[in-house]
Amino acid sequence: MRVMEMRKNCQHLWKWGTMLLGMLMICSAAEDLWVTVYYGVPVWKEATTTLFCASEAKAYKTEVHNVWAKHACVPTDPNPQEVLLENVTENFNMWKNNMVEQMHEDIISLWDQSLKPCVKLTPLCVTLNCTDANLNGTNVTSSSGGTMMENGEIKNCSFQVTTSRRDKTQKKYALFYKLDVVPIEKGNISPKNNTSNNTSYGNYTLIHCNSSVITQACPKVSFEPIPIHYCTPAGFAILKCNDKKFNGTGPCKNVSTVQCTHGIRPVVSTQLLLNGSLAEEEVVIRSENFTDNVKTIIVQLNASVQINCTRPNNNTRKSITKGPGRVIYATGQIIGDIRKAHCNLSRAQWNNTLKQVVTKLREQFDNKTIVFTSSSGGDPEIVLHSFNCGGEFFYCNTTQLFNSTWNSTEGSNNTGGNDTITLPCRIKQIVNMWQEVGKAMYAPPISGQIKCISNITGLLLTRDGGEDTTNTTEIFRLGGGNMRDNWRSELYKYKVVRIEPLGVAPTRAKRRVVQREKRAVGTIGAMFLGFLGAAGSTMGAGSITLTVQARHLLSGIVQQQNNLLRAIEAQQHLLQLTVWGIKQLQARVLAVERYLRDQQLLGIWGCSGKLICTTTVPWNASWSNKSLNMIWNNMTWMQWEREIDNYTGIIYNLLEESQNQQEKNEQELLELDKWANLWNWFDITQWLWYIRIFIMIVGGLVGLKIVFAVLSIVNRVRQGYSPLSFQTHLPAPRGPDRPEGIEGEGGERDRDRSGGAVNGFLTLIWDDLWTLCSFSYHRLRDLLLIVVRIVELLGRRGWEALKYWWNLLQYWSQELKNSAVSLLNTTAIAVAEGTDRIIEVAQRILRAFLHIPRRIRQGLERALL
């Protein structure tokens, strides 16, 4: 019984042991994943970088110094590439776009730089004795459009100017527009001179003299806006949204990538956007927040409205010298037509445009009544439509454009027709600089008539606010003044991204490297020592931080380049570099920095020159537990990058540590390289070394043989023995019953042999070598026989063990099978018995129901009886 109990316990132990072994085999069969580095993956991240310009500046009046291009932009690409990104959805935000800020700063720098060498008007900030210019004597043409210039619109002023001799002044005369001078004190001329007209006189000064530094634009400066393409340096790209109804914010499903934007004309204007891009389908309105009346509404039209502006009168320009090389240009006289400057546009086109704008505004503001009205007041640049036309700055009244009410059906006071709308304009020569406070520019008069044709492509609207939520009317006015909105109307569909070509993902492939145990070394502290922190360490300790030093070295190079760029930017007025020149230099240096950084990381990870690089870093499921099929077949690189974005720093550090350990292992392996591969022993380059060793061994053996022979002879001589010859036969002693032999060479000879002593040195060497080889052969043969015997025993034992395990596996398989069959039989019997019981109960219940009528009949019979 005791034996049977022990046998049962052993059987249970074998059963559980087999189950554990199977579980271990299943767990060990699970495949391991390893980090693989990929270079050139299509991944990007939002970034801000230095953009540079491309333009065909030489095609626009090469003899004129253009403010915008300055001939420093690179030529445009004749075949620009635009790559459509399929199945890509990207978020855009035109109101938080660094490209707008960068363009704004660039235009400011260009204005400042173009005016830097020009003449300051400080000597003209004196008292001007002005009267109304007499315009009655001019010839008036009968051309249509425009109104007569009002009396007093132009002032004839006299002032004192210092000549080339500083102690001598000279009186000069010049014509100034009424908007450019402000009165100091004003009165009427004395009655004795009041015989011809009611001309007023007074003391004036130039506007902005007390608050700004006025600079005269250089004579050959041209303000004609030419298309400027903003481009990204290498390593960056521009994403472009091609959705035709894109409102400026939110996701865009039709995305492409370009290297440069389209040609953007930096038109400085208010209220109306001129010569911009058009919407492809319907009118589009954009605002950062439509419910906030402070936010400007940018309207992009789908069809342009042509506006023709002109200054009819023919002005002459006179020069006033105030010193050597310093000349001030002013209006000498007005010849010919004395009508006001004005702009004409088609009423039908404008009304059709307003109708489409109203439709979009109603969609946004719940079908309310839309009222367009004039500006509520402010600076002339805001109240009037200001822009540059042929070098003169026009300020036009747009009340006729925005003076209508649109109810739910049609505009109430919107007059139709095909007539022309004429906007009266005034000209200012002293313009308050829009980009900075405290600066103003004097635009010298342009001689001759001025005409310019522009296209209205957009509007800048502001909405009146109010707390009355029940109001059914929304009032809109033309606005502007913030030039960022002008640039934003063109850059709304672009965003700059930084290309991240390095990607990591799990694969089944593992780098084949030297396998050694990782030793615990104190590298954590050294990682934070910095670039020069390991200078006082030993060479062994310093080699651990080589990657840290390489990284800090590159950071030092980048820092030096940034310092150089800042120095150049600070001294660009001495180096004569334009803002575009600075940006091109920054862009090119930035591209080199990006490339060096990527190559540095690849080198640190041991992946230089590889597009796909396997590593020995195991993939951690905590980074992403998705399967390989899910990752490689269902996710894009952008989605995968977002998945592991929080762990890329950890992965990079592990890759660096793994490569450091691998390099250390390889260094230790090189020290044992001669013993690493037995096949190298047969390398022909080692034969001379082998021959030399062989000669040394043979020489040593022969020398030992000679030494021992001499010592033996000396020992025998000392014992009184004198050898007759080296060939003397020394037979072994025999017994009396073993004769030496019989005649005829019969009989048995002794086994002992006495070989004759060899003659000569070479014969002696050969004899020793033969003895050595024979000894080595016999020993190797014995060793081989022992090894064969051991292998045979191991094989027999192994085969017996395999047969034992196989029989055990068969036994337990049969036991499991029998147990399963027994369990199934028991279950089947229990189910069958239960089913029989259920069927029997159901039959009894059914019989009871069937016997109810019989029981009723029997009861009635008993009752009747």
Curated annotation (Swiss-Prot):
Q: Where is this region: CD4-binding loop?
A: 375-385
> CDD domains from the entry?
HIV-1-like_HR1-HR2
UniProt PTM comment: Highly glycosylated by host. The high number of glycan on the protein is reffered to as 'glycan shield' because it contributes to hide protein sequence from adaptive immune system. Palmitoylation of the transmembrane protein and of Env polyprotein (prior to its proteolytic cleavage) is essential for their association with host cell membrane lipid rafts. Palmitoylation is therefore required for envelope trafficking to classical lipid rafts, but not for viral replication.
Organism expressing this protein natively: Human immunodeficiency virus type 1 group M subtype B (isolate RF/HAT3) (HIV-1)
Question: Could you identify this protein by its name?
Answer: Envelope glycoprotein gp160
The site feature described as Cleavage is recorded at 519-520
User: Where are the stretches annotated Immunosuppression?
Assistant: 583-601
Q: Where is this motif: Di-leucine internalization motif?
A: 864-865
Region (V2) residue ranges read 157-209
Membrane side Extracellular: residue ranges: 32-693
The answer to keyword Electron transport applying to this record is no
Q: Which residues form a coiled coil?
A: 642-676
Q: Name one GO molecular function term.
A: structural molecule activity
